[in-house]
Amino acid sequence: MPPGGSGPGGCPRRPPALAGPLPPPPPPPPPPLLPLLPLLLLLLLGAAEGARVSSSLSTTHHVHHFHSKHGTVPIAINRMPFLTRGGHAGTTYIFGKGGALITYTWPPNDRPSTRMDRLAVGFSTHQRSAVLVRVDSASGLGDYLQLHIDQGTVGVIFNVGTDDITIDEPNAIVSDGKYHVVRFTRSGGNATLQVDSWPVNERYPAGNFDNERLAIARQRIPYRLGRVVDEWLLDKGRQLTIFNSQAAIKIGGRDQGRPFQGQVSGLYYNGLKVLALAAESDPNVRTEGHLRLVGEGPSVLLSAETTATTLLADMATTIMETTTTMATTTTRRGRSPTLRDSTTQNTDDLLVASAECPSDDEDLEECEPSTGGELILPIITEDSLDPPPVATRSPFVPPPPTFYPFLTGVGATQDTLPPPAARRPPSGGPCQAERDDSDCEEPIEASGFASGEVFDSSLPPTDDEDFYTTFPLVTDRTTLLSPRKPAPRPNLRTDGATGAPGVLFAPSAPAPNLPAGKMNHRDPLQPLLENPPLGPGAPTSFEPRRPPPLRPGVTSAPGFPHLPTANPTGPGERGPPGAVEVIRESSSTTGMVVGIVAAAALCILILLYAMYKYRNRDEGSYQVDQSRNYISNSAQSNGAVVKEKAPAAPKTPSKAKKNKDKEYYV
């Protein structure tokens, strides 16, 4: 049959299509240009923007150490006059011969702690020695920044916790009565200073070398090890970086004994235009001494030549763009709850300053960053040395002993935490803001945003280099202590993970179940209460025992005076006063000891039982052999012996028959 023919049954001719060569596949269509248009547009826009920026900005340092503690200062040169934007030099004050002082004071609850600062001011004077501007930290910290004139030249001295760092411009004489513009920036321990059109003077203190390699290496260092690295660097003499808790800006130098005489215009510090605030009679600004407001235009002391020189200098000089540590407002002692949600005044989009201590305040002891979702403690510490006079927590009523839930040390997860709306009160102020445990009625949250530790906000802000010395290490879990409000019965949850071992939470806190494999079935009747509660439904059929003193205390409520509380100074306690460590191995060690004792007891019982059975088996075989020998002897005995055995009931008929037979034969 030909290849293209049909079969005898009239089948269709399908083989020809299979037998012939396959046609070549069609060429792929050209890629559409429409998806590539956005990319091309972005490239064009980027090139145009780069050309525009390069025409107006020239960068001296492009290294931005976002992860470095003390990287070089990012400097952006702005050709537009800074103090003359809008055609004027800003608000101008004249300081008289008797000296004057303008003081801007931050509210106690809004004092910023910054890693980077910038200061710009215009002035004219004939003095060869005076203090223009000084920024001081809170009392007892010792951080400061001072702009002064010494021997006719401008200099800046500052200290952020390590040593005094000085930077000056010896080539520019500013005591000539002309208008000069000074720009200063600080990034950690590094600083730059520029006077008019002179080149930027940079200062890198000792201990700041290899910053680029450190910044690259820091990106690969695990977050939980960051503090260890910082400690090592600090021991090696690394410069501290945070200007802690800035309290006041003072202009005029009258308080320093070196009063300034002349004109000051358009002072700018970290987004604050202090002279403008003084002209507006801001409540945070106080003025004293021989002071006169000139206005927002150039002062009458400026000649036409001086003004022209100033404009040219401003066109040629640079503006150093810096940023400050990103932080949210914190609540310190005595702060009203509503200040939690208040925003810090920002007059410049390049600056974000706030009252919360940043991630590395180096000079203090404790700090409370905002809560995030990072590392947290399996070891919870709570100071219970000063118990409140009034009960702040309700007792914990345990469930039946078989299902007794206690926290074992895996760490509470988000399932055990209430939603953020429930965690934070409507007023906005966190419970741990600045109040003691006695008057705290809001959740105590153990967490960390950048550091992830347990924080106590009743203490001043701290730096991350010193913070870890007073608190234990952290893990990646979050634990929330519930609000200390009385509740009639506990709200037990059975679907969450567990928290720190041996930690007994308040009844309103979720009480999660034990994880799989963690339940102790050998010791079910061991609740964690000193005495059983007397409320309705409380179990009273067992004798409670006191757990080992390895957990933070829980304040007892009225009617429950025997709830256990931590007593760091009591016998058998370990650790510093006020901090009680929860040790993970306590439950496992107890279980291991109980298991060993039970196994030993079981082995002893098995051995005794075996010995008993072996002894009984020996005695039984002896009796059987003896009785068997007795039966065989009785069968072989004569008639006299048989007659002695006649009283036996089963032997009587046979013996009588034998006797009868004997009588018959006789």
From Swiss-Prot:
Annotated localization: Presynaptic cell membrane
Transmembrane segments: 591-611
Cytoplasmic side: 612-666
Key words, A-Z: Calcium, Cell adhesion, Cell membrane, Cell projection, Glycoprotein, Heparan sulfate, Membrane, Metal-binding, Proteoglycan, Repeat, Signal, Synapse, Transmembrane, Transmembrane helix
PROSITE patterns for the chain: LAM_G_DOMAIN
CDD domains: LamG
Annotated signal peptide: 1-50
Role: Neuronal cell surface protein that may be involved in cell recognition and cell adhesion.
Binding-site positions, Ca(2+): D143, V160, I242, N244
Laminin G-like domain boundaries: 91-299
Topological domain spans for side Extracellular: 51-590
Post-translational note: O-glycosylated; contains heparan sulfate. Heparan sulfate attachment is required for synapse development by mediating interactions with neuroligins.
One Pfam family named in its UniProt record: Laminin_G_2
Membrane topology: Single-pass type I membrane protein
GO molecular function, one term: cell adhesion molecule binding
Domain comment as written in the entry: Alternative splicing in the laminin G-like domain regulates binding to alpha-dystroglycan.
InterPro entries for the chain: ConA-like_dom_sf, Laminin_G, Neurexin-like, Neurexin-related_CASP
Family designation: Belongs to the neurexin family.
Biological source species: Homo sapiens (Human)
Protein name: Neurexin-2-beta
Annotated glycan sites: N190, S354
Regions of compositional bias (Gly residues) in chain numbering: 1-10
